[in-house]
Amino acid sequence: MRDIKTYLSVAPVLATLWFGSLAGLLIEINRLFPDALAFPFF
């Protein structure tokens, strides 16, 4: 039971850190390369 409580307290923290860093990465990519849906490579 203690392991389950430890897991339930760790998983939201890791998920928050992961999604926060992912959102920050996407924001920085969109800041450096705006309008990424239409890359003007052609």
Swiss-Prot record:
It is a single-pass membrane protein. Its main location: plastid. One of its GO terms (biological process) is photosynthesis. It is found in: Plastid, Chloroplast thylakoid membrane. The chain crosses the membrane at residues 7-27. Keywords: Chloroplast, Membrane, Photosynthesis, Photosystem I, Plastid, Thylakoid, Transmembrane, Transmembrane helix. GO terms for cellular component: chloroplast thylakoid membrane; photosystem I. HAMAP family: PSI_PsaJ (MF_00522). Belongs to the PsaJ family. May help in the organization of the PsaE and PsaF subunits. This is Photosystem I reaction center subunit IX. It comes from Chloranthus spicatus (Chulantree).
